Amino acid sequence: VPMHKRTWRLVATAATFVALTTAAVGCGSDGGSTASSTTKAGSGEGAKGSTLAVPGDYKTIQEAVDAAKAGDLVLVDEGTYNEAVDVSTADITIRGVDRNKVILDGEFKLENGIRVLDTDGVTVENMTARNYVSNGFFWTGSDRYHGSYLTAYRNGDYGIYAFDAYHGQLDNSYGSGSPDAGFYIGECFKCDAVIDTVVSEYNGLGYSGTNSGGDLYIINSTFAHNRAGMVPNSGSYELCYPGRSNTIVGNTVYDNNYLEGPGIDASLLAQGNGILLAGSINNTVERNLVYDHERTGISAVPFPEDDASDVPPPASDLDKPCDEVKDQDLPEKSPGFVLWPATGNSIVGNVVSGSGLADIAEGTIPEGG
């Protein structure tokens, strides 16, 4: 099944952001970051099933996953595994014995380290995925997903990625070296998901989420040295638009001015911003420490989409679950250029300093513009 590939279709340039009218306030402080640790995993019977050891019982992770039944634990020993693992058995756990010594390596040829496709209740933990053409760890069309103590670096799209997935948690994990986002949750409402205690650095975007929100919490995490830090956004190129009702609390976001590494076009547009609400509405941004950005610390700006397939939905549709709106008919005629608003956001109680344009900014478009 081909992976859904996200592309931001833009005609705007970085000058679009600079041209937006801004109103700024600021306050000073400083801070640092924390990194996630590694856990040691033991063998033995799973909580509800058996333990399948790799390579003791099965030579490859894929063979063990294919043999697993609900409730089983696939326990992976130290080593480098040149595999692209597809998971289609629900309610299993795939766990490495050592996060830094259990390595899935795509050798710049394989698509995804571990892909969970339309399968519920899959936990992946305590391992590393690197050098994949697309993603390190990927859940799509899945419910009750969990990724914990994971490292994903130098992958072609995303590090750790959940798409059209619900009731999930990504925690104590690290993402680096992705041209798109180190962490991404997209196309879900209400997502009922949390990103907690992660570190994302040296990516195009530290965090990105298109058309996602609703009980979606991004908390207690560090986003640093990316082209842009955190960028919830909207667009008709994916379903369930717009992005809305994210809760971004207690994060440390700093020095997202990275120039030398990989970056998709959208990350070039967003570069130099800490928390950028790009056409995303009704979000809560509170008690974050944000500092040292060449453009803005925290900003909410309209997002320009060229060749859009639809316009923003009416307010009466904003509380509808994604499943109720994703099959609605599109307009017979494409609306062409659409500007997604960034309204209704609550940005309070943050500590922001060292911003080149404004510590806190709101972008507006002149009437008739």
Report the location of each language-model feature.
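Acidic, glycine- and Ser/Thr-rich low-complexity intrinsically disordered tracts
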Residues: 72-75, 306-369
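Right-handed parallel beta-helix/beta-spiral solenoid domain characteristic of secreted/periplasmic
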Residues: 50-59, 73-78, 84, 90-133
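C-terminal motif of bacterial Sec signal peptides marking the signal peptidase cleavage site
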Residues: 22-26
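Bacterial N-terminal signal peptides that target proteins for export
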Residues: 3-14
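Glycine-rich beta-solenoid repeat tracts in large extracellular/virion proteins
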Residues: 65, 84-88, 112-118, 135-141, ...
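Right-handed parallel beta-helix
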Residues: 97-101, 120-131, 143-158, 166-181, ...
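Bacterial signal peptide processing site
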Residues: 28-30
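Short, T/G/N/S-enriched strand-turn elements that build extracellular solenoid repeat scaffolds
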Residues: 61-68, 81-89, 104-105, 138, ...
